[in-house]
């Protein structure tokens, strides 16, 4: 079993992005599954292109994309991605798409085919707050999640995939009053726990 897990580079003036900080601290294997870690550009279109290059190269069984959700207090497992880009702020190359369809031949929305409720349950069993989210937004996180699920639907039908949002790190909120954060250790542990839940689901099939 091979799992590709990605995190984003920093964006929006931040020096770090907790998603890739956590991803790069993951072990190289979890319960005999190989863990392949990669950074993704916080850029519309390019993010999906890089992800597909990684899929072609690595041929993973499971793909988990991880992103930063500043302002959220817990780990959130995304249920659905929608076929729209609507950026309030520019991406890392200055793109600000407004009400743009991601793929003309794609569905209005695609649902994660990961065991999202079992992932939340396992993270909570690890004493870390978690919940299901029903909106990944309309920025690059939703864009990449939609792109992943589109690719699964169109080309890689045996592959499983989904998206996890993580909170800010403590150092990111030093000058952000009343904004929640989570330690890097807890974010890393939450990712490990979610991967274990996924592996249990598919190893039991």
From Swiss-Prot:
Database matches in SUPFAM superfamilies: Pyrrolidone carboxyl peptidase (pyroglutamate aminopeptidase)
Family label: Belongs to the peptidase C15 family.
Annotated Gene Ontology cellular component terms: cytosol
Function summary: Removes 5-oxoproline from various penultimate amino acid residues except L-proline.
Gene3D superfamilies cross-referenced by the UniProt entry: Peptidase C15, pyroglutamyl peptidase I-like
Name assigned to this protein: Pyrrolidone-carboxylate peptidase
Main location: cytoplasm
Catalytic activity, as annotated: Release of an N-terminal pyroglutamyl group from a polypeptide, the second amino acid generally not being Pro
PROSITE patterns, A to Z: PYRASE_CYS, PYRASE_GLU
Residues at the active site: 78, 141, 165
Lineage start: Bacteria, Thermotogati, Thermotogota, Thermotogae, Thermotogales
Compartments it resides in: Cytoplasm
Binding partners and assembly: Homotetramer.
UniProt EC number: 3.4.19.3
GO BP annotation list: proteolysis
NCBIfam families, sorted: PRK13197.1 (NF009676), pyro_pdase (TIGR00504)
Record InterPro entries: Peptidase_C15 (IPR000816), Peptidase_C15-like (IPR016125), Peptidase_C15-like_sf (IPR036440), PGP-I_bact-type (IPR029762), PGPEP1_Cys_AS (IPR033694), PGPEP1_Glu_AS (IPR033693)
Any GO MF annotation of the entry: pyroglutamyl-peptidase activity
HAMAP family: Pyrrolid_peptidase (MF_00417)
Superkingdom in the source lineage: Bacteria
Keywords linked to the UniProt accession: Cytoplasm, Hydrolase, Protease, Thiol protease
